[in-house]
Amino acid sequence: MTTIVSVRRHGKVVMAGDGQVSLGNTVMKGNAKKVRRLYHGEVIAGFAGATADAFTLFERFEAQLEKHQGHLVRAAVELAKDWRTDRSLSRLEAMLAVANKDASLIITGNGDVVEPEDGLIAMGSGGAFAQAAARALLLKTDLSAREIAETSLHIAGDICVFTNHNITIEEQDLVG
C-alpha cells in the first residue's frame, strides 16, 4: 500500500506521499509518484491502494472537476455518487485525498466524502502512524505544514514496512 499525509497550516496546504509499490510482501517499485496536481494545478491529489484503480479514480475525479469548474467539494460528492452506483467503480480498491485552497477531503473506497475538522489527512498502510506523528507536531510545535507532512511520513516509513522514505511533496498557498 502506501502512506499519504496532508496538512493545512500557516497559509499552506501540503500533501505528501511515499513512493513504494508492493505486490504482496515484495517491493516492486520505490519511486512511484502518488501525489500529483489536477485541474490546472489548483488541486492536489494523492492515492492509497491499488495503483490501476487509483488512476481510474484520478481520471474520473478530474472529469468531475472540469464539469464543475474546479469546485472541489462538488466534484468529490459527484465522484462519490458515481462510486456508489457504478458497479465497475464500486470494485475499485483505492482511496483519494484531495485538497485545494478551500478544503481537504478524503474520498473513501465505499464512496464516502470526509472533510477532517483539523485539516489533517493521513491514510494508507502507514496512515495511523503518520496521523499520530502529525497530530503531535501540530499540537506541540510551530513547524510548517511541509515540515510536519515530511516528518510524519518519515516516522511512518520507519514503522510501516509498506511505506518508504522516497517522498513526493506538493504545496499550495491557501490564499489567492
Curated annotation (Swiss-Prot):
One of its GO terms (biological process) is proteolysis involved in protein catabolic process. Coiled coil: none annotated. It is an enzyme of class 3 (hydrolase). Allosterically activated by HslU binding. Keywords: Allosteric enzyme, Cytoplasm, Hydrolase, Metal-binding, Protease, Sodium, Stress response, Threonine protease. One of its GO terms (cellular component) is HslUV protease complex. Na(+) binds at residues 157, 160, 163. One of its GO terms (molecular function) is metal ion binding. It comes from the Bacteria. Gene3D superfamilies: Glutamine Phosphoribosylpyrophosphate, subunit 1, domain 1. The keyword Cytoplasm applies. InterPro entries: ATP-dep_Prtase_HsIV_su, Ntn_hydrolases_N, Proteasome_sua/b, Proteasome_suB-type. It holds the Pfam family Proteasome. It is found in: Cytoplasm. Its EC number is 3.4.25.2. It catalyses: ATP-dependent cleavage of peptide bonds with broad specificity. The active site is at 2. PROSITE patterns: PROTEASOME_BETA_2 (PS51476). Belongs to the peptidase T1B family. HslV subfamily. Protease subunit of a proteasome-like degradation complex believed to be a general protein degrading machinery. HAMAP family: HslV. A double ring-shaped homohexamer of HslV is capped on each side by a ring-shaped HslU homohexamer. The assembly of the HslU/HslV complex is dependent on binding of ATP. PANTHER family: ATP-DEPENDENT PROTEASE SUBUNIT HSLV, METALLOPROTEASE TLDD. This is ATP-dependent protease subunit HslV. It comes from Pseudomonas savastanoi pv. phaseolicola (strain 1448A / Race 6). The lineage of its organism: Bacteria, Pseudomonadati, Pseudomonadota, Gammaproteobacteria, Pseudomonadales. The gene is hslV.
